[in-house]
Amino acid sequence: MLPRKLKIDSTELAEITNELVQFLNCLVLRSGGLKKEHIWVRNGRILDERTVFFEEKTMADVQIDCEGLILSPGFIDLQLNGGFGIDFSTYNSDDKEYQEGLALVAKQLLAHGVTSFSPTVITSSPETYHKILPLLKPSNASSEGAGNLGAHLEGPFISADKRGCHPEQLVITSLSPNPVEIIEHVYGSTENIAIVTMAPELEGAQEAIEYFVSTGTTVSVGHSSAKLGPGEMAVLSGAKMITHLFNAMQSYHHRDPGLIGLLTSSKLTPDHPLYYGIISDGIHTHDSALRIAYHTNSAGLVLVTDAIAALGMSDGVHKLGTQTIHVKGLEAKLDGTNTTAGSVASMPYCIRHLMKATGCPIEFALQSATHKPATLLGVSDEKGTLDVGRLADFVLIDKNVTVKATFCSGKRVFLAQD
């Protein structure tokens, strides 16, 4: 039987289950760049076309014409505070309400091409963590929304001087005398935690980093007054990331470059790699700083949005945890201050801006929102690439990174309306 030939706007694409599907006429994002290839999918995963041809000796049940679009892995956002009116740091004593808000954000992210994210909780009280964290169980992407990679806890173990918009009264500036006991008291279980941002100069921080690493949690250094030395010690202890590079840390100084100096540290080795999140929205990070990061350590660059509840909403007053935020255009400011308080930029916007600011090729920008964050979190065997065996979570975009359609496990879950 000949394959059924469909366009990306066919209603059938939202219902496909165990059929053999071939995506044609697309530019596929590979490690070596964009390649004019086909993608084969069945039962939600990417197949090896050699298996189809030489072992199964079969034809596709369905062929989908991708109309020359770029087929990229779904975008991965490792720092997302909320969006669409929902703030992940706000808990109103109602588990169902919180879960409904989380589900709403996950659903809306599909229109942005985001298929996996880490819901981010800023500095909060132990009571809040104990209520929220059990509700942030990891999940895969589906027609219901983007997958949850586990929580990114940004605080409370940070520098009071570099707290940014985090509530000062909840910041914890020492993990002494018993870091593990303090962590367990503050967070409760670490089961649903994917990333912890902490300041490496705090007393007890190195032991805390080693503990987090032993639990499989990724440690990111940030919101910190640290000089380079404590940052390097953190990397040697297992920290793998810098949180929103250039923001909430010491400025670069030629005698002690602080955490920014980690980008060129001699301590970085294949055994101790380092990634850094960067907010490419034209507000948090000047284009010149983006270029410095890109040309200094391009391999570690990971795009994050740091978006807040105002993402996808109109200008006005919004919340970030217990803090009040004023949003105008792409700028979000803490009430009564000039402190930048998260972003309202989408991931496609950040990808476009990185290309514009640095002149990097689209392949690099896309890898920085797909393969690199997946590798950082250790989930690249399932997500972040279009290699054989991976989940068929991908996005069809044009050269301007306009999202045309999003697929999760091979099913179309979002279609842009012309």
From Swiss-Prot:
Substrate binds at C165, H166, N247, A248, R255, D281, G282, I283, H284, T340, A341, G342. GO terms for biological process: N-acetylglucosamine catabolic process. InterPro entries: Amidohydro-rel, GlcNAc_6-P_deAcase, Metal-dep_hydrolase_composite, Metal_Hydrolase. It comes from the Eukaryota. CDD domains: NagA. Its cofactor is a divalent metal cation. GO terms for molecular function: metal ion binding; N-acetylglucosamine-6-phosphate deacetylase activity. Its EC number is 3.5.1.25. It is an enzyme of class 3 (hydrolase). Binds 1 divalent metal cation per subunit. The active site is at D306 (proton donor/acceptor). A divalent metal cation binds at E154, H223, H244. The keyword Isomerase does not apply. It catalyses: N-acetyl-D-glucosamine 6-phosphate + H2O = D-glucosamine 6-phosphate + acetate. Keywords: Carbohydrate metabolism, Hydrolase, Metal-binding. Belongs to the metallo-dependent hydrolases superfamily. NagA family. This is N-acetylglucosamine-6-phosphate deacetylase.
